[in-house]
């Protein structure tokens, strides 16, 4: 049985972890969301979220976006390559409803899977 937990090992926790991704990222972008990824040596994917107050003003909207990104990652972690991912959002993401945002995230993570298979 596949575990769908979201323990600390699956999260980017320190600035050092985030900087590792920002140095040489692979990008997958849409007008509202960008997912940066970089191969890691851990054998499992990890995720970090950066949602600036400048781009999404209201806290409940930022929390909704983070919740949806974490949930998509949690449910699909076993299909993702062993990479560190950072999810960045732009203005306009708050106008997307939950279904649209989930579709955008899915499309971007599938693109990262294809990029990882090529390299």
Curated annotation (Swiss-Prot):
* Catalytic activity field: Endonucleolytic cleavage of RNA, removing 5'-extranucleotides from tRNA precursor
Cellular component per GO?
Answer: ribonuclease P complex
| Matching Pfam families | Ribonuclease_P (PF00825)
Out of the domains of life, which is the source?
Bacteria
Going by the UniProt record, its keywords in alphabetical order are: Endonuclease, Hydrolase, Nuclease, RNA-binding, tRNA processing
Q: EC number(s) for this protein?
A: 3.1.26.5
Q: Check the record and name the SUPFAM superfamilies matching this protein.
A: Ribosomal protein S5 domain 2-like
Q: How does it assemble?
A: Consists of a catalytic RNA component (M1 or rnpB) and a protein subunit.
Name of this chain's protein: Ribonuclease P protein component
């Amino acid at each position: 049985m596949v575990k769908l937990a979201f323990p600390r090992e699956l999260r980017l926790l320190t600035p050092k972890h985030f900087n590792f991704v920002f140095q040489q990222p692979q990008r997958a972008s849409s007008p509202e969301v960008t997912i940066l990824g970089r191969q890691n040596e851990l054998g499992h994917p990890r995720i970090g979220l950066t949602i600036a107050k400048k781009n999404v003003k209201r806290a409940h909207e930022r929390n909704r976006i983070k919740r949806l990104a974490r949930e998509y990652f949690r449910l699909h972690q076993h299909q993702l390559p062993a990479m560190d991912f950072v999810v960045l959002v732009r203005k306009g993401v708050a106008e997307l409803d939950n279904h649209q945002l989930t579709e955008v995230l899915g499309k971007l993570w599938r693109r990262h899977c294809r990029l990882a298979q090529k390299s």
